[in-house]
UniProtKB/Swiss-Prot annotation:
InterPro entries recorded: Ribosomal_uS4, Ribosomal_uS4_bac-type, Ribosomal_uS4_CS, Ribosomal_uS4_N, S4_RNA-bd, S4_RNA-bd_sf
Start and end residues of each S4 RNA-binding domain: 96-159
Subunit structure: Part of the 30S ribosomal subunit. Contacts protein S5. The interaction surface between S4 and S5 is involved in control of translational fidelity.
Key word Cytoplasm present: no
Keyword RNA-binding among UniProt keywords: yes
Name assigned to this protein: Small ribosomal subunit protein uS4
Protein backbone atom coordinates (compact mmCIF):
# COMPACT_ATOMS: atom_id res chain seq x y z
CA UNK A 1 0.00 0.00 0.00
CA UNK A 2 2.85 2.41 0.83
CA UNK A 3 4.31 1.80 -2.64
CA UNK A 4 0.99 2.74 -4.22
CA UNK A 5 0.65 5.87 -2.09
CA UNK A 6 4.25 6.90 -2.81
CA UNK A 7 3.65 6.57 -6.54
CA UNK A 8 0.43 8.55 -6.23
CA UNK A 9 2.22 11.34 -4.35
CA UNK A 10 4.76 11.65 -7.17
CA UNK A 11 2.04 11.86 -9.80
CA UNK A 12 0.16 14.45 -7.76
CA UNK A 13 3.28 16.60 -7.49
CA UNK A 14 3.86 16.20 -11.22
CA UNK A 15 0.40 17.51 -12.10
CA UNK A 16 0.03 19.93 -9.19
CA UNK A 17 -3.23 18.16 -8.42
CA UNK A 18 -4.30 15.91 -5.54
CA UNK A 19 -5.01 12.56 -7.21
CA UNK A 20 -6.22 11.25 -3.83
CA UNK A 21 -8.48 14.32 -3.59
CA UNK A 22 -7.36 14.89 -0.01
CA UNK A 23 -4.53 17.36 -0.52
CA UNK A 24 -2.29 15.21 1.70
CA UNK A 25 0.22 14.82 -1.10
CA UNK A 26 1.33 18.40 -0.60
CA UNK A 27 3.20 19.61 2.46
CA UNK A 28 1.17 21.88 4.75
CA UNK A 29 -1.71 21.69 2.29
CA UNK A 30 0.14 23.72 -0.34
CA UNK A 31 0.97 22.54 -3.82
CA UNK A 32 4.67 22.17 -4.42
CA UNK A 33 6.28 23.93 -7.31
CA UNK A 34 9.06 21.36 -7.61
CA UNK A 35 9.16 18.25 -9.73
CA UNK A 36 9.29 14.76 -8.12
CA UNK A 37 12.70 13.63 -6.85
CA UNK A 38 14.81 13.73 -3.73
CA UNK A 39 15.31 17.45 -3.93
CA UNK A 40 13.18 18.36 -6.88
CA UNK A 41 13.80 21.03 -9.44
CA UNK A 42 12.05 24.34 -9.57
CA UNK A 43 9.28 23.99 -12.11
CA UNK A 44 9.86 26.38 -14.95
CA UNK A 45 7.01 28.71 -15.80
CA UNK A 46 6.57 27.73 -19.43
CA UNK A 47 3.47 28.63 -21.39
CA UNK A 48 1.73 25.38 -22.28
CA UNK A 49 0.13 25.06 -25.70
CA UNK A 50 -3.55 24.23 -26.15
CA UNK A 51 -2.51 20.73 -27.25
CA UNK A 52 -0.31 20.40 -24.15
CA UNK A 53 -3.12 21.50 -21.84
CA UNK A 54 -5.48 18.93 -23.32
CA UNK A 55 -2.90 16.15 -23.08
CA UNK A 56 -2.00 17.02 -19.50
CA UNK A 57 -5.65 17.07 -18.42
CA UNK A 58 -6.27 13.69 -20.03
CA UNK A 59 -3.20 12.19 -18.35
CA UNK A 60 -4.12 13.72 -15.00
CA UNK A 61 -7.62 12.24 -14.94
CA UNK A 62 -6.43 8.93 -16.39
CA UNK A 63 -3.91 8.58 -13.56
CA UNK A 64 -6.48 9.73 -11.02
CA UNK A 65 -8.82 6.85 -11.87
CA UNK A 66 -5.98 4.43 -12.62
CA UNK A 67 -7.05 3.47 -16.13
CA UNK A 68 -5.02 2.37 -19.12
CA UNK A 69 -5.20 4.46 -22.28
CA UNK A 70 -7.47 1.88 -23.91
CA UNK A 71 -9.84 1.75 -20.92
CA UNK A 72 -9.96 5.54 -20.76
CA UNK A 73 -10.73 5.91 -24.45
CA UNK A 74 -13.37 3.15 -24.40
CA UNK A 75 -15.09 4.89 -21.49
CA UNK A 76 -15.11 8.13 -23.48
CA UNK A 77 -16.61 6.31 -26.47
CA UNK A 78 -19.36 4.93 -24.23
CA UNK A 79 -20.07 8.42 -22.87
CA UNK A 80 -20.49 9.74 -26.43
CA UNK A 81 -23.45 7.40 -26.94
CA UNK A 82 -25.28 8.80 -23.90
CA UNK A 83 -27.70 11.71 -23.88
CA UNK A 84 -26.67 14.85 -22.04
CA UNK A 85 -23.37 16.69 -21.58
CA UNK A 86 -20.51 14.54 -22.88
CA UNK A 87 -17.88 15.65 -20.36
CA UNK A 88 -20.20 15.16 -17.40
CA UNK A 89 -21.35 11.76 -18.67
CA UNK A 90 -17.71 10.74 -19.00
CA UNK A 91 -16.97 11.61 -15.37
CA UNK A 92 -20.15 9.87 -14.19
CA UNK A 93 -19.07 6.66 -15.93
CA UNK A 94 -15.63 6.87 -14.30
CA UNK A 95 -17.26 7.40 -10.91
CA UNK A 96 -19.65 4.47 -11.44
CA UNK A 97 -16.84 1.92 -11.78
CA UNK A 98 -16.79 -0.67 -9.01
CA UNK A 99 -13.18 0.03 -8.02
CA UNK A 100 -13.96 3.74 -7.68
CA UNK A 101 -17.06 3.16 -5.54
CA UNK A 102 -15.08 0.81 -3.28
CA UNK A 103 -12.65 3.73 -2.87
CA UNK A 104 -15.44 6.27 -2.35
CA UNK A 105 -16.98 4.09 0.36
CA UNK A 106 -13.65 4.20 2.19
CA UNK A 107 -12.82 0.49 1.99
CA UNK A 108 -9.37 1.41 0.65
CA UNK A 109 -7.11 4.44 1.02
CA UNK A 110 -6.40 4.54 -2.72
CA UNK A 111 -8.13 3.57 -5.94
CA UNK A 112 -5.27 1.18 -6.67
CA UNK A 113 -5.88 -0.56 -3.37
CA UNK A 114 -9.60 -0.70 -4.15
CA UNK A 115 -8.79 -2.28 -7.50
CA UNK A 116 -6.77 -4.97 -5.73
CA UNK A 117 -9.67 -5.75 -3.40
CA UNK A 118 -11.90 -6.23 -6.44
CA UNK A 119 -9.34 -8.22 -8.43
CA UNK A 120 -8.75 -10.61 -5.53
CA UNK A 121 -12.46 -11.34 -5.18
CA UNK A 122 -12.92 -9.55 -1.85
CA UNK A 123 -15.89 -7.42 -2.98
CA UNK A 124 -19.54 -8.42 -3.27
CA UNK A 125 -22.18 -6.59 -5.30
CA UNK A 126 -25.74 -7.39 -4.24
CA UNK A 127 -24.38 -10.42 -2.40
CA UNK A 128 -22.43 -11.85 -5.35
CA UNK A 129 -18.68 -11.72 -5.94
CA UNK A 130 -17.61 -9.35 -8.70
CA UNK A 131 -13.90 -9.30 -9.56
CA UNK A 132 -14.00 -6.87 -12.49
CA UNK A 133 -12.79 -3.37 -11.46
CA UNK A 134 -14.43 -1.74 -14.50
CA UNK A 135 -17.85 -3.21 -13.65
CA UNK A 136 -20.36 -0.35 -13.87
CA UNK A 137 -22.68 -0.12 -10.91
CA UNK A 138 -26.35 0.77 -11.16
CA UNK A 139 -28.15 3.06 -8.74
CA UNK A 140 -29.24 1.04 -5.71
CA UNK A 141 -26.48 -1.55 -5.95
CA UNK A 142 -25.15 -2.75 -2.60
CA UNK A 143 -21.38 -3.11 -2.24
CA UNK A 144 -19.63 -4.84 0.64
CA UNK A 145 -16.36 -6.43 1.65
CA UNK A 146 -16.69 -10.20 1.97
CA UNK A 147 -16.95 -11.61 5.50
CA UNK A 148 -13.40 -12.98 5.69
CA UNK A 149 -11.96 -9.51 4.95
CA UNK A 150 -14.17 -7.35 7.17
CA UNK A 151 -11.63 -7.49 9.99
CA UNK A 152 -8.69 -6.88 7.67
CA UNK A 153 -6.34 -4.32 9.22
CA UNK A 154 -5.89 -2.25 6.04
CA UNK A 155 -9.62 -2.16 5.32
CA UNK A 156 -10.46 -1.07 8.87
CA UNK A 157 -7.67 1.51 8.86
CA UNK A 158 -8.92 2.96 5.57
CA UNK A 159 -12.47 3.17 6.95
CA UNK A 160 -11.28 4.83 10.13
CA UNK A 161 -9.26 7.42 8.21
CA UNK A 162 -12.03 8.13 5.71
CA UNK A 163 -12.90 11.70 6.65
CA UNK A 164 -15.88 12.26 4.38
CA UNK A 165 -18.17 10.30 2.09
CA UNK A 166 -19.82 11.92 -0.90
CA UNK A 167 -23.60 11.98 -0.84
CA UNK A 168 -24.10 9.71 -3.85
CA UNK A 169 -22.83 6.78 -1.76
CA UNK A 170 -23.89 5.63 1.71
CA UNK A 171 -21.61 3.59 3.95
CA UNK A 172 -22.18 1.46 7.03
CA UNK A 173 -18.75 1.30 8.66
CA UNK A 174 -19.78 -1.26 11.26
CA UNK A 175 -20.90 -3.76 8.62
CA UNK A 176 -18.29 -2.67 6.04
CA UNK A 177 -20.90 -2.27 3.35
CA UNK A 178 -22.44 0.54 1.39
CA UNK A 179 -24.81 1.57 -1.35
CA UNK A 180 -24.51 3.43 -4.63
CA UNK A 181 -27.42 5.74 -3.83
CA UNK A 182 -27.57 7.81 -7.02
CA UNK A 183 -25.48 9.09 -9.90
CA UNK A 184 -23.09 11.85 -8.87
CA UNK A 185 -23.73 15.45 -9.81
CA UNK A 186 -20.96 17.43 -11.48
CA UNK A 187 -20.80 19.85 -8.55
CA UNK A 188 -19.89 16.96 -6.23
CA UNK A 189 -16.78 16.07 -8.20
CA UNK A 190 -13.43 17.84 -8.30
CA UNK A 191 -13.57 21.40 -9.58
CA UNK A 192 -9.92 21.00 -10.58
CA UNK A 193 -10.89 18.69 -13.43
CA UNK A 194 -11.50 20.39 -16.78
CA UNK A 195 -13.31 17.64 -18.65
CA UNK A 196 -13.90 19.99 -21.58
CA UNK A 197 -10.18 19.75 -22.35
CA UNK A 198 -10.46 15.96 -22.50
CA UNK A 199 -13.44 16.25 -24.86
CA UNK A 200 -11.41 18.60 -27.05
CA UNK A 201 -8.47 16.14 -27.00
CA UNK A 202 -10.52 13.21 -28.26
CA UNK A 203 -12.40 15.36 -30.77
CA UNK A 204 -9.02 16.40 -32.14
CA UNK A 205 -8.05 12.72 -32.57
CA UNK A 206 -11.33 11.88 -34.29
CA UNK A 207 -10.82 14.67 -36.83
CA UNK A 208 -7.41 13.27 -37.85
Amino acid sequence: MSRFIGSTFKKSRRFGFSILETGKEFSKGKKRITTPGQHGKERAKVKVSEYGQQLQEKQKVKFMYGLSERQFRNTFAKAKKMQGILGTNFLVLLESRLDNIVYRLGFSATRQGARQLVNHGHILVNGKKVDIPSYLLSVGDLVEVKASMKKNEKVLEALQNNEATLEFVKVNKNEVKGEFVRLPERTELSSEISESLIVEWYNRLIKK
